[in-house]
From Swiss-Prot:
The record marks 127, 340 as: Interaction with tRNA. SUPFAM superfamilies: Adenine nucleotide alpha hydrolases-like. This is tRNA-specific 2-thiouridylase MnmA. HAMAP family: tRNA_thiouridyl_MnmA. It comes from Staphylococcus carnosus (strain TM300). The gene is mnmA.
Amino acid sequence: MSNQDTRVVVGMSGGVDSSVTAYLLKEQGYDVIGIFMKNWDDTDENGVCTATEDYNDVIAVCNQIGIPYYAVNFEQEYWDKVFTYFLDEYKKGRTPNPDVMCNKEIKFKAFLDHAMKLGADYVATGHYAQVRRDADGNVEMLRGVDNNKDQTYFLNQLTHEQLSKVMFPLGGMEKSEVRRIAAEQDLATAKKKDSTGICFIGERNFKEFLSNYLPAQSGDMRTLNGKKMGTHSGLMYYTIGQRHGLGIGGDGDPWFVVGKNLEDNVLYVEQGFHHDALYSDYLIASDVSLVNDIDLTDGLECTAKFRYRQKDTKVTVTRIDENQIRVDFDQPVRAITPGQAVVLYDGDVCLGGATIDDVYKEAGQLTYIV
């Protein structure tokens, strides 16, 4: 099939990455349509969320490069699949990753389904990742060339079927090159800053935002030996390994969050970056999603990331059952956080990932969440 007979629907956010994605595909002769996804109702947020402004930028870019554009509303799907998950995880004392869930449920599910109804052969986004295909229809996901921007961590839940319909035109490029192309073409978004933070929070204070949806309950801040060190303002506001915002004075090493007790509403803290309570030897994770089937019965040696932009750690992965894996680390790892993603790699190939449930030392489960 020639490029001009291949319809690619581009998810456009109003940012520079998706703008250049659409431009490159148009230049390559594809039949390109731009779609702006409205995932969050910004009418009651005092204008902080910039959906209207972003859509105007999408319109400007699409008019510049000469492609049709539409806006589609996924607010209900987003609320049901991403935001309620986000709140439920915080209620459990965990630290969720809404970007992973947004990619899984919205950008590569609701949006993909919508694009197929428009006759799309592929969808494309401005993510920094790569898709490798062969003649037999096999698909692999690879890290983006720009190490600093690689987004495979957030795409770890994509299935083989989803990836077979996806293009990532920026995956082989550095961010600086993307900016250069945008400037050369004088795209409306060329000088726009990269967005930061979770889409539905924007630049607002996270603590303030969360308290609108979940009631906070203050409680004791204690060492693992039970010594009271202060008062916390609500367990959901703290994450494992957190240093700032504890309000513990005095001399010596800084203090860090090492655990939570939901039943007694206690936040555990200990002193020192390398405190033993922050280190673990293995984890159990669920919601396992692998791009391609891998036999994990005898253990797979590969590498893993436990948070975005972290260096890879050598691990051995064993399947417990259909939905759970055990990941053993070659060396103890610091501040692994339940609710976050563990993402598996074989060299530059992203194998898939899972959601961290429990973290252990060889001697037994840590006190991260009791």
